């Protein structure tokens, strides 16, 4: 019986691993707003983040979404907004010893072959538990631009000045930091709170932009912001990916019989005034990550119903699913959800990845979640999904591929391809290994041994009698892959 169970486990593992796609977004959110870094010194926070990144890489994660602006503040050096209290414990106080978490995280992610997406909360200016704002905070300097709501401060989306300010903050990030993506989450107009009313009747009556319905007017305010942010990114660094992670329900069918889902919950369109599908259809965003945090069988918002709805409706841009690790483990649904993802992933489907909420739960291996990722579901590395709507070219081939003995052992070296412009330049390389005589199929991710920013790879030399074929390709900023270069090597 024990042998039979072991055999079945090996078969399941083999089938699951072989079904992995070569291209898949495997992200994880690292948030600061939960206070996990407060009270840490520079060295402890760097050590904590290094450990998290190492564990996430082992789990197969290839992109980190790092929160850098939770309440019109900054986890990076900014001339526009104060240092975040979620970094130092007091808003406006610089870290000591001094460091720049965003700059540091970019370097740490890139050297591990991972992308770094800077995550901002665009309109939230104060969280409920923030008692003191720095003197240079926008709510202190320009209080007329924000409104209070259920203990929060919100930058009023009705003001063009606010939309312009957020775009200026983003442009500053893009100009000074080598980020791969710019990410915003589900906070637009505030989540409805009992007894609270959004105080924007004056703005609506004085500047309604031709709208007679205040809900349509609010949606238009957010739409204008999304379009302006898209245009800002395109103007500054067109290769940077713009992603949005909305609440998991667009509209319920009872509100919209044609485009609503068979759900009964809060709605992006009606309650947060966020018309996600419009942004996807217009091409204003580059990827969409709905937060489908419920379990399969949830009566108000069934996971399977929602993942199928988003796959059917979010068709003009890559779709990644926001996954709640703790809830998935609680209901014992990791295998079932993964099988559902696998059945929907593919070249003809908008579903092209997953983002884990939240990174620390994977690092802590809640319910064995991380173990299953690294050993079964994400056993092999994955490249990022293609985005031909941003750029469809590819880098040239690597040059002068050659194994050389060094003081560090046997090392495979190559030179970067020549490039005509920055967007086509190689920024990472993929190294594949095949046994001698084996078919060279670089679409099979089981042959990937490294995704690296370096122009070398340390070879696992044994006795010099085993023959292998190594293949090296180059990736540009959008993970377009070059033609392959082969090298026969004895190890």
What are these regions (language model features)?
Residues 417-443, 484:
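Solvent-exposed loop/turn segments flanking beta-strands in beta-repeat/beta-sandwich domains
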Residues 459-481:
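Beta-strand-rich modules
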Residues 162-169, 175-184, 188-262, 266-303, ...:
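Active-site neighborhood of glycoside hydrolase catalytic domains
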Residues 368-423, 479-491:
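Pro/Thr/Ser/Gly-rich low-complexity, intrinsically disordered linker/stalk tracts
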Residues 74-89, 124-149, 186-209, 254-266:
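Aromatic- and acidic-residue-enriched segments that line the glycan-binding/catalytic groove
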Residues 29-31, 35-47, 118, 122-172, ...:
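Active-site-adjacent "subsite" loops/lids of carbohydrate-active enzymes
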Residues 273-299, 314-389:
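Substrate-binding cleft of secreted/luminal carbohydrate-active enzymes
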Residues 47-74, 176-179, 278:
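Catalytic domains of carbohydrate-active enzymes, especially glycoside hydrolases
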């Amino acid at each position: 019986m024990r042998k039979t169970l072991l055999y079945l486990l090996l078969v399941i593992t083999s089938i699951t691993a072989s079904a992995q796609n070569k291209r898949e977004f495997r992200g994880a959110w690292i948030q600061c707003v939960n206070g996990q870094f407060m009270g840490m010194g520079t060295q402890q926070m760097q050590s904590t983040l290094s450990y998290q990144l190492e564990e996430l890489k082992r789990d197969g994660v290839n992109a980190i979404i790092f929160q850098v602006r939770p309440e019109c503040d900054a986890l990076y050096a900014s001339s526009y907004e104060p240092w975040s209290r979620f970094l130092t414990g007091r808003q406006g106080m610089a870290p000591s010893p001094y460091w720049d978490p965003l700059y540091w995280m970019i370097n740490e992610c890139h050297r591990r072959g991972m992308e770094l997406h800077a995550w901002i909360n665009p309109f939230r200016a104060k969280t409920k538990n923030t008692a003191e704002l720095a003197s240079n905070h926008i709510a202190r300097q320009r209080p007329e631009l924000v409104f209070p709501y259920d203990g929060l401060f919100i930058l009023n989306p009705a003001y063009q000045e606010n939309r312009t300010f957020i775009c200026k903050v983003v442009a500053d990030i893009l100009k000074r930091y080598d980020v791969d993506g710019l990410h915003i989450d589900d906070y637009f107009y505030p989540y409805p709170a009992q007894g609270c009313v959004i105080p924007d009747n004056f703005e609506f009556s004085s500047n309604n932009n031709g709208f007679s319905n205040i809900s349509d007017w609010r949606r238009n305010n957010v739409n204008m912001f999304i379009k302006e942010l898209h245009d800002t990114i395109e103007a500054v660094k067109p290769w940077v990916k713009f992603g949005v992670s909305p609440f998991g329900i667009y509209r319920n069918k009872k509100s919209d019989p044609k485009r609503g889902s068979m759900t009964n919950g809060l709605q992006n369109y009606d309650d947060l005034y966020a018309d996600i599908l419009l942004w996807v259809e217009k091409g204003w965003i580059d990827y969409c990550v709905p937060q489908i945090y419920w379990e399969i069988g949830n009566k108000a918002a069934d996971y399977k119903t929602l993942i199928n709805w988003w796959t059917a409706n979010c068709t003009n841009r890559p779709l990644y699913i926001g996954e709640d690790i703790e809830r998935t483990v609680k209901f014992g649904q990791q295998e079932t959800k993964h099988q559902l993802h696998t059945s929907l992933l593919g070249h003809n489907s908008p579903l092209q990845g997953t983002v884990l909420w939240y990174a620390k739960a994977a690092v802590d291996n809640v319910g064995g979640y991380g173990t299953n990722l690294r050993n079964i579901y994400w056993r092999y590395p994955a490249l990022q999904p293609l985005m031909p709507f941003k750029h469809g070219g590819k880098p040239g081939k690597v040059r002068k591929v050659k194994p050389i003995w060094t003081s560090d052992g046997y090392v495979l070296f190559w030179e970067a391809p020549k490039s005509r412009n920055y967007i086509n330049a190689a920024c990472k390389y993929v190294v594949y290994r095949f046994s001698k005589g084996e078919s060279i199929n670089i679409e099979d991710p089981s042959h990937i041994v490294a995704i690296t920013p370096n122009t070398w790879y340390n070879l696992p030399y044994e006795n010099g009698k085993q023959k292998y074929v190594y293949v090296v390709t180059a990736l540009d900023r959008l993970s377009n892959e070059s033609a392959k270069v082969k090298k026969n090597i004895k190890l």
